[in-house]
């Protein structure tokens, strides 16, 4: 019988109703007018007047799963989807503000990792929504090895260069309290798996995409894109253990592509993970740092890391 591994709480998603993310004060939260010293001017968040909490997060995910990003009339497409989902989820909110916020998020560039593409450019044939997976851990029902989360940290510490966004997080995974053995099956679903053709390599690239509705600003401040600048969303990725979630999602996508693509090459085809903190995404004019817009977290795994992690989850650490 399938089961989730012990320690599955590490993969919790959005905070509960009324709970704020912890990253709003990273680097000084009081100055919401600019992107920091020498940074771009912040924009008001299109999501500022919309509610928080898990119910709203579920609504956003349900809408994004059903919207045709490539529809000729995006506003009409969004309006129809939002109307149906508001009726289903029975939520009372500003319908026009929600449609506008979704539209601006879909129009926001995804940064250099995705060659600046927007979700708006994604055709239905190039997306898989809610890609479900079941990963057996060290043999599943009949364990054939030992595994704990610290072994993942050890692998990352050994393989990631110092400047990699996950390098510091590796130390967190190596902490003693994460040493409890995990076993069974890891089940879940990926919000979106997208495909685009890398024109330089003339090869399809596949990315894991995860939508996050976390509210990172202080309650007394107007929410802006400044609250979703790189250091703020990076801190939230670590606080929520979203980096671990991204790693496991990439293993799931890697195994799926290995099964479905005859000529699959992880180094060539596995693009990485895009975590979209939607409240920081304000359309084409969203302030960017080194080309990556506010609210967008991108990670491209070094060659071989995801394959090695997949093998570790399958075989265990051997100790």
Residues of each region from the PLM?
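Structural signature of nuclease core domains in nucleic-acid processing machines
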Residues: 1-319
């Amino acid at each position: 019988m399938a089961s989730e591994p012990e320690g599955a709480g590490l993969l919790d998603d959005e905070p509960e109703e009324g709970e704020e993310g912890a990253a709003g004060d990273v680097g000084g939260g009081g100055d919401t007018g600019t992107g920091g010293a020498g940074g771009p001017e912040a924009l008001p968040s299109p999501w500022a007047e919309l509610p928080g909490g898990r119910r709203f997060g579920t609504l956003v995910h349900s809408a994004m799963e059903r919207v045709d990003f490539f529809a000729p009339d995006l506003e009409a497409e969004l309006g129809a989807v939002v109307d149906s989902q508001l009726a289903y989820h029975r939520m009372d909110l500003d319908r026009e503000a929600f449609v506008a916020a979704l539209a601006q998020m879909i129009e926001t560039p995804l940064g250099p990792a995705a060659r600046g593409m927007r979700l708006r450019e994604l055709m239905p044939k190039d997306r898989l929504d809610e890609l479900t997976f079941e990963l057996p851990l060290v043999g599943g029902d009949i364990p054939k090895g030992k595994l704990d989360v610290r072994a993942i940290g050890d692998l990352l510490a050994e393989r990631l260069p110092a400047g990699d966004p996950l390098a510091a997080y590796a130390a967190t995974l190596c902490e003693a309290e994460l040493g409890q053995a995990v076993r069974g099956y890891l089940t879940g679903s990926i919000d979106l798996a997208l495909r685009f053709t890398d024109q330089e390599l003339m090869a399809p690239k596949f990315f894991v995409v995860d939508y996050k509705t976390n509210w990172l600003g202080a309650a007394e401040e107007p929410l802006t894109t400044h609250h979703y600048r790189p250091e703020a969303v990076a801190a939230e990725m670590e606080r929520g253990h979203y980096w671990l979630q991204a790693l496991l999602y990439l293993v799931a996508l890697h195994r799926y592509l290995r099964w479905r693509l005859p000529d699959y090459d992880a180094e060539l085809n596995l693009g990485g993970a895009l975590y979209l903190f939607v409240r920081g995404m304000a359309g084409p004019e969203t302030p960017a740092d080194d080309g990556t817009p506010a609210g967008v977290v991108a990670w491209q795994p070094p060659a071989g890391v995801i394959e090695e992690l997949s093998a570790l989850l399958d075989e265990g650490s051997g100790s």
